[in-house]
Amino acid sequence: MKFEKIAFVATEMPEAEAARKALSRRYGDAKPEEADVIVALGGDGLMLQTMHQHMKRRIPIYGMNRGSVGFLMNEYRDDNLTERLAAAECATIHPLRMRASLADGSCHEALAINEVALFRETYQAAKIRISIDGKTRMEELVCDGVLVATPAGSTAYNLSAQGPIVPIDAALLALTPISAFRPRRWRGALLSHRAQLRFEILEAEKRPVSAVADHTEFRQVREVEVEEDGSIDMLMLFDPDHGLEERIITEQFLY
């Protein structure tokens, strides 16, 4: 695929900003809203931010690592960028849609590329009832929290919480507890990407819980619904032989 107009975005870190200026001089710099590809210079945080900002445009985004964490980024090189973009492999990502009902009666929605997570707000453990497709699957999970991760997000917080790594082309979501106290041996579940999840907060006034979709947080939630939004396609570009699928496989053999 050949791209005519490239837009460069970068973090405020000196290394990233210097790379943006150098690449802009060499390849030109279109406005993001006029470009047909965006090159993000930074770490995974910038990649997620850029994907959120342009989520509904279906514009391909190619990341190059000028940050600290670069799982979603390609290696930085200033040579042959147009050729790299033309040869890049594309991964299509669908976000999670979270609907949160709060203690004050209000309802809010947010989208997540990596995960939707529920956390206890105080020293009291959270108590959460979990339903899948309208059927209660766990009457009471006593925990620090619980999360739902996409395949793209399964190597992020989900992995740190001992959740499974999910291949990028698997039509699955990972449901993972965070420091489960009861049932102590429950390690979560793999669910169809079409699953509709509902989390009900038990003893909510005594045990307040917040809900976070990537970087969007709502506090004192009473109920949270989560499902994949298949109507939104996000396109990520990766160098051949170093695509997201390969990275996820490699991650499973690190020790």
Curated annotation (Swiss-Prot):
Highest taxon in the source lineage: Bacteria
Catalytic activity, EC: 2.7.1.23
Reactions it catalyzes: NAD(+) + ATP = ADP + NADP(+) + H(+)
A single GO molecular function term of this UniProt record: metal ion binding
Keyword Acyltransferase (UniProt): no
Matching SUPFAM superfamilies: NAD kinase/diacylglycerol kinase-like (SSF111331)
Family to which the UniProt record says this protein belongs: Belongs to the NAD kinase family.
Stated role: Involved in the regulation of the intracellular balance of NAD and NADP, and is a key enzyme in the biosynthesis of NADP. Catalyzes specifically the phosphorylation on 2'-hydroxyl of the adenosine moiety of NAD to yield NADP.
Name under which the protein is recorded: NAD kinase
